[in-house]
């Protein structure tokens, strides 16, 4: 039996989807029982969150009880902050479980997890030196920034010491964490791409040809590091409608930017907010191209992978792990709307590019392949 551990973020994002898909994979493809022990940052409150960070976790005995009650042999830990911390992992080990630590982001070193602040990529925090995050107030709240800086400096080594093995989503993520002096046991750090359930289904419908009804699609949390403003400017230059699915702190500013371009032929921008899976599938089926204009060093690029799995050509920034997934023709410099516009004009409606992308993402994220690799990692953890 595998017990998943995850502290949900205030704003739901790709990591929550990956956790859900991995739980599905364990149950349906590996054939093991799986349960999720979950807490939510939204429910904690600032005082209790700070307590969890500074103490290295709240109520670790809840985790120990769950391990014993369910007979879990492996604890698969995802986001631990602010409520679980290293004490949850130690409690699981004491109760008899082996620990697999899954680092979806850079949160072991970076207080915001994405190595991005004040409009640019940032790698100032290294190892236990997390003071730059406090000085720059990366969390947007001095008390919160102080709590994260102290917690990372105090407890990051304790977290790692509890892990029998560590999973990261890409080669780039592993090397970035190494460059950040993350105190990881590198011989036990393994790369595992997330599974995409959609790749188990029928092939995606044929890509609609580019034409007056064409639109580009961005599926993203609306935050500065995601570069949605670049997509707005690029689609305005390319004369193609842009649909934006997602929400976040930058929505108001992005809507204002889009209003400035109204009246330009073909430059309509529509903000759809969060959409459910069924609506997202419909949007992808009718789009001509998907854009992933990130400014930050993505640890994987889930939005790109899901669009490729849906049969869309993808244009993405040449940052982070995106070049491991997206072919060279679909990569552009981050923050360059004219380069992005040019790629949109070349690739919108390109069925050959879509077919190549589908083949690439199948090689990386097919559920059967990911299941085999994950089952082997669980066996390694059990044998330590």
Regions found by a protein language model. Give the residues of each.
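A charged, aromatic-enriched C-terminal amphipathic alpha-helix characteristic of glycosyltransferases
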Residues: 349-379
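Conserved acidic donor-binding segment of nucleotide-sugar-dependent glycosyltransferases
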Residues: 329-338, 344-350
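Nucleotide-activated donor-binding/catalytic signature segment of Leloir-type glycosyltransferases, i.e.
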Residues: 255-278
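Short alpha-helical donor nucleotide-sugar binding micro-motif in glycosyltransferases
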Residues: 274-275, 282-287
């Amino acid at each position: 039996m595998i017990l998943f551990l995850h502290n949900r973020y205030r704003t739901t994002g790709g990591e929550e989807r990956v956790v859900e898909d991995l739980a599905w994979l364990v149950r349906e493809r590996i054939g093991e029982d799986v349960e999720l022990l979950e807490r939510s940052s939204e429910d904690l409150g600032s005082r209790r969150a700070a307590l969890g960070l500074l103490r290295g976790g709240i109520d670790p005995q809840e985790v120990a009880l769950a391990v014993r009650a369910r007979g879990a042999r492996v604890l698969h830990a995802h986001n631990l902050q602010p409520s679980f911390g290293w004490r949850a992992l130690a409690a699981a080990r004491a109760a008899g479980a082996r620990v697999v630590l899954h680092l979806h982001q850079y949160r072991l070193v970076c207080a915001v997890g994405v190595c991005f602040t004040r409009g640019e990529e940032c790698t100032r925090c290294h190892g236990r030196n997390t003071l730059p995050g406090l000085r720059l107030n990366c969390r947007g709240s001095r008390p919160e920034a102080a709590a994260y800086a102290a917690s990372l400096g105090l407890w990051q080594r304790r977290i790692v010491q509890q892990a029998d093995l560590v999973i990261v989503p890409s080669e780039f993520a592993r090397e970035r964490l190494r460059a950040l002096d993350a105190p990881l046991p590198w011989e036990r750090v393994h790369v595992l791409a997330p599974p995409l359930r959609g790749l188990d289904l029928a092939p995606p419908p044929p890509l609609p040809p580019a034409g007056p009804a064409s639109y580009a699609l961005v599926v993203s949390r609306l935050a500065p590091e995601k570069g949605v403003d670049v997509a707005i400017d690029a689609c305005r230059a390319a004369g193609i409608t842009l649909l934006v699915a997602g929400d976040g702190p930058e929505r108001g500013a992005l809507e204002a930017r889009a209003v400035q371009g109204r009246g330009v032929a073909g430059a309509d921008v529509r903000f759809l907010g969060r959409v459910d899976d069924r609506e997202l599938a419909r949007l992808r089926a009718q789009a001509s191209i998907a854009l992933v204009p990130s400014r930050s060093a993505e640890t994987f690029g889930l939005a790109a992978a899901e669009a490729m799995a849906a049969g869309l050509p993808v244009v993405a920034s040449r940052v982070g792990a995106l070049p491991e997934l997206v072919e060279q023709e679909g990569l552009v410099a981050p923050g360059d709307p004219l380069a992005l516009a040019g790629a949109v004009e070349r690739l919108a409606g390109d069925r050959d590019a879509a077919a190549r992308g589908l083949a690439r993402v199948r090689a990386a994220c097919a559920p059967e392949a990911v299941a085999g690799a994950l089952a082997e990692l669980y066996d390694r953890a059990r044998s330590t």
